[in-house]
């Protein structure tokens, strides 16, 4: 396995009117567990269903209804913890987080404050070749999602859809290790990539299946190092939380605005108030939502309806044995086995389906050539037409067939691109299509020699120029390929032209 080592990036420095400042960011990612049923009921989790059609008596808090833990959701949380190199707690417990909101029918949320199912882990976030930030994970806990309030159906009424109520969430809490807006977006992207590889969350931010709460503070240069020495959070400044971010771009914009807002307050001699804020993408600014609550504000206490959750190490080991190859390991293997560059390996492993496609194309073939075709031709065409790898009309076997025809010398690179275009629009077997369209490269040296002789005989002045300047021999190569309808093998033409001209 290729050994990949990284250097930590420098923190983002923002110049204020009076001083330089550094950013400190911690994140809480709410990832919806990929499961057909909710955390404590058997109701469906299908997105987009008719309002209030996926609701059980447990979800809407009918009297006497008791929650029953969904074992699959627990397994998904364990799998996620293992994927983040985290400690799996064999004993965890559920607590009630008490607050009132119209779309929370119980009047409390079942969560895990005191004894989460997953402890400390880490995520390596690559920012550039050889540059990466190691972000520590503090904990992962399971909790229920709330419902959805709808305010735009009637000017005088609000409606509630309980379909999402009780859906399992994993809250993934990071340490304040992120040091800039770009790092924050890269962290979310890397975490989403890992979750998708694991199959524990689909990472669909548009549907709200992955949401981020972003904690932002600013401090003077050198203060972060004091925090690292003492673990005293006061060195990091007063943080504000930006809630429910569901876009990488908005995350970066919100952090940048919030940092400058806090800097302006501090440089004017004021104090930053710890609070929860919302980002308004239309105005490009954050606004106050409410004062930031502490744990005691929610009156947490152990849920009396749920026993402590005890799992066996053997069960954890079974899950560990079924773990897929994760992005970092796959990237290192692609670089080692197929000789692709760091950049290409990142592109090829960004999505699990894309990595599988590439590997099918590259297996037994030139890895660099396969990467070039997959990234430039296939991905380029998919991006242009707004398609995903699952929608591609050119399957891996077909693209592999094109590369085989190139390798055997039957078609040239230009012919291969024309063949790819035909396969994209019409489909078919590459070898059969190439044969039917007469897309066969001329490799017969006798035929090529005849064409070269004719071109040389017709252009004596050009011959003298080429003998004086060998670089001009390329003109003859182009003329021969043109004369053969683009079918002559360029390498063979080059060799014969050089021989005939005595170069």
UniProtKB/Swiss-Prot annotation:
Question: What this chain does, per the record?
Answer: Allows the formation of correctly charged Asn-tRNA(Asn) or Gln-tRNA(Gln) through the transamidation of misacylated Asp-tRNA(Asn) or Glu-tRNA(Gln) in organisms which lack either or both of asparaginyl-tRNA or glutaminyl-tRNA synthetases. The reaction takes place in the presence of glutamine and ATP through an activated phospho-Asp-tRNA(Asn) or phospho-Glu-tRNA(Gln).
Q: Which domain of life is it from?
A: Bacteria
Which InterPro entries does the record cross-reference, listed alphabetically?
A: Asn/Gln-tRNA_amidoTrfase_suB/E (IPR017959), Asn/Gln-tRNA_Trfase_suB/E_cat (IPR006075), Asn/Gln_amidotransferase (IPR018027), Asn/Gln_tRNA_amidoTrase-B-like (IPR003789), GatB (IPR004413), GatB_C_1 (IPR042114), GatB_Yqey_C_2 (IPR023168), Gln-tRNA_amidoTrfase_suB_CS (IPR017958)
Name of the molecule in the record: Aspartyl/glutamyl-tRNA(Asn/Gln) amidotransferase subunit B
- Which residue ranges traverse the bilayer? none
Gene Ontology terms: biological process: glutaminyl-tRNAGln biosynthesis via transamidation; translation
Q: What does the sequence similarity comment in the record state about its family?
A: Belongs to the GatB/GatE family. GatB subfamily.
Q: Which HAMAP family match?
A: GatB
Gene3D superfamilies for the chain: 1.10.10.410, GatB domain, N-terminal subdomain
Q: Which GO terms describe its molecular function?
A: asparaginyl-tRNA synthase (glutamine-hydrolyzing) activity; ATP binding; glutaminyl-tRNA synthase (glutamine-hydrolyzing) activity
Alphabetized, the UniProt keywords read:
ATP-binding, Ligase, Nucleotide-binding, Protein biosynthesis
The record's catalysed reaction(s) read: L-glutamyl-tRNA(Gln) + L-glutamine + ATP + H2O = L-glutaminyl-tRNA(Gln) + L-glutamate + ADP + phosphate + H(+); L-aspartyl-tRNA(Asn) + L-glutamine + ATP + H2O = L-asparaginyl-tRNA(Asn) + L-glutamate + ADP + phosphate + 2 H(+)
Q: Which organism is it from?
A: Cereibacter sphaeroides (strain ATCC 17023 / DSM 158 / JCM 6121 / CCUG 31486 / LMG 2827 / NBRC 12203 / NCIMB 8253 / ATH 2.4.1.) (Rhodobacter sphaeroides)
Instruction: Name the gene behind this protein.
Output: gatB
Enzyme class, first EC level, given as a word: ligase
Q: What are its E.C. numbers?
A: 6.3.5.-
Subunit structure and binding partners:
Heterotrimer of A, B and C subunits.
What Pfam families does this protein map onto?
GatB_N (PF02934), GatB_Yqey (PF02637)
């Amino acid at each position: 396995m290729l050994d990949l080592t990284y250097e930590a990036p420098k923190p983002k420095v923002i110049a204020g009117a009076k001083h330089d400042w550094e950013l400190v960011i911690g994140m809480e990612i709410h990832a919806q567990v990929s499961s057909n049923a909710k955390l404590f009921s058997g109701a469906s989790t299908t997105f987009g269903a008719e309002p209030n059609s996926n609701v059980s008596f447990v979800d809407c808090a009918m009297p006497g209804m008791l929650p029953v833990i969904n074992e699959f959701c627990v397994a998904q949380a364990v799998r996620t913890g293992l994927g983040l190199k985290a400690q799996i707690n064999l004993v965890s417990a559920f607590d009630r987080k008490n607050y009132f909101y119209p779309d929370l029918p119980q009047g409390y949320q079942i969560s895990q404050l005191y004894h989460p199912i997953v402890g400390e882990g880490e995520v390596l976030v690559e920012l550039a070749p050889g540059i990466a930030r190691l972000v520590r994970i503090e904990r992962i806990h399971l909790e229920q999602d709330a419902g959805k309030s709808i305010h735009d159906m009637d000017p005088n009424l609000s409606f509630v859809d309980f379909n999402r109520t009780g859906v399992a969430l994993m809250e993934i809490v990071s340490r304040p290790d992120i040091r800039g807006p770009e790092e924050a977006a890269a962290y979310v992207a890397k975490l989403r990539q890992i979750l998708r590889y694991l199959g524990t969350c689909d990472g669909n931010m548009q549907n709200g299946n992955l949401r981020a709460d972003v904690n932002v503070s600013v401090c003077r240069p050198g203060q972060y190092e004091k925090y690292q020495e003492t673990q005293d959070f006061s060195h990091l400044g007063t943080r504000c939380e930006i809630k429910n971010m569901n876009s990488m771009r908005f995350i970066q914009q919100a952090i940048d605005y919030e940092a400058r807002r806090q800097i302006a307050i501090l440089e004017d001699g004021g104090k930053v108030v710890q609070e929860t804020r919302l980002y308004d993408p239309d105005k490009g600014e954050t606004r106050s939502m409410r004062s930031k609550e502490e744990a005691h504000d929610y009156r947490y206490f152990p849920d009396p309806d749920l026993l402590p959750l005890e799992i066996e190490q053997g069960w954890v080991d079974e899950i560990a044995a079924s773990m897929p190859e994760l992005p970092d390991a796959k990237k290192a293997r692609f670089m080692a086995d197929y000789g692709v560059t760091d950049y290409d390996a990142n592109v090829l492993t960004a999505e699990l389906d894309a990595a599988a496609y590439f590997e099918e194309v590259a297996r037994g073939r030139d890895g660099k050539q396969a990467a070039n075709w997959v990234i430039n031709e296939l991905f380029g065409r998919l991006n242009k037409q707004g398609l995903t790898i699952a929608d591609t009309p050119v399957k891996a076997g077909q693209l592999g067939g094109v590369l085989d025809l190139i390798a055997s010398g039957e078609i040239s690179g230009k012919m291969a691109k024309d063949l790819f275009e035909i396969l994209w629009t019409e489909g078919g077997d590459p070898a059969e299509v190439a044969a039917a369209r007469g897309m066969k490269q001329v490799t017969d040296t006798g035929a090529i020699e005849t064409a070269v002789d004719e071109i040389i005989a017709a252009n004596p002045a050009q011959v003298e120029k080429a003998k004086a300047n060998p670089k001009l021999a390329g003109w003859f190569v182009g003329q021969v390929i043109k004369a053969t309808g683009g079918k002559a093998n360029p390498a063979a033409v080059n060799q014969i032209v050089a021989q005939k001209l005595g170069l």
